[in-house]
Design a protein with these regions (language model features):
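Non-catalytic cap/lid and distal C-terminal segments of serine-dependent acyl enzymes
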Residues: 1-191
Length: 191
């Protein structure tokens, strides 16, 4: 509102599964942050997709990484040459997956309270959600595939991107977060 730049960096904020695009507005001062930093903040609703082109559902990865950036650039003075992406829990998975899968698109990626979900065992009540997004209820079978964040880090081509992973011992995904943190430390992202 108070910034008069010709274009603005874009921060994509992704909510956890079960929250919609209003979660950041309801629980944080995200509008004040955007104004203070002079950035555009986009908060898409990813439903229960984990930011993926769902096996049984919509193409959220395509929407997040291609269609929405084009739309944002059409309607706002967005600098798509400087994009950042961050998310919480399942949104954190989506943020890292997008950043690692589309080299050069993001300058920074951050995940809060989420690791590489391919190392987790999930409650059976999540079976339908997982099957719709990933095509399986046992995500451990996806280790070594393009759905495995550890594999994406090990094979990443864009090491100029800043990568951040934050988690605590109280997080639901602490086990896979620790494994992902170890993978990041062993990669060229940590140098």
């Amino acid at each position: 509102e108070n910034n008069e730049k010709s274009s603005y960096p874009v921060l994509w904020l992704l909510p956890p599964a079960g929250c919609d695009h209003t979660a950041w507005q309801r629980h944080t001062a995200v509008e004040d942050l955007a104004d203070e930093l002079g950035i555009i903040i986009v908060m898409p609703d990813l439903k229960l997709s984990y930011g993926l082109d769902m096996i049984h559902g919509f193409t959220y990865f395509q929407m997040l990484t291609k269609e929405l950036p084009e739309m944002v650039a059409d309607y706002f003075p967005a600098d798509l040459g400087f994009q950042m992406i961050a998310g919480v829990k399942e949104g954190g998975y989506a943020a890292l997956n997008a950043a690692l899968s589309v080299p050069g698109q993001y300058h920074m990626a951050a995940s809060y309270s989420c690791g590489s979900l391919t190392d987790e065992t999930f409650d059976p009540e999540m079976d339908k959600q997982l099957d719709n997004a990933f095509g399986t209820t046992d995500l451990r079978t996806l280790n070594g595939t393009d759905k495995d964040l550890k594999m994406l880090i090990q094979t990443a081509k864009d090491h100029n991107m800043a990568l951040s992973l934050e988690y605590s011992e109280k997080d639901d995904y602490k086990a896979s977060s620790a494994l992902l943190a170890d993978c990041i430390l062993k990669s060229s992202f940590s140098s």
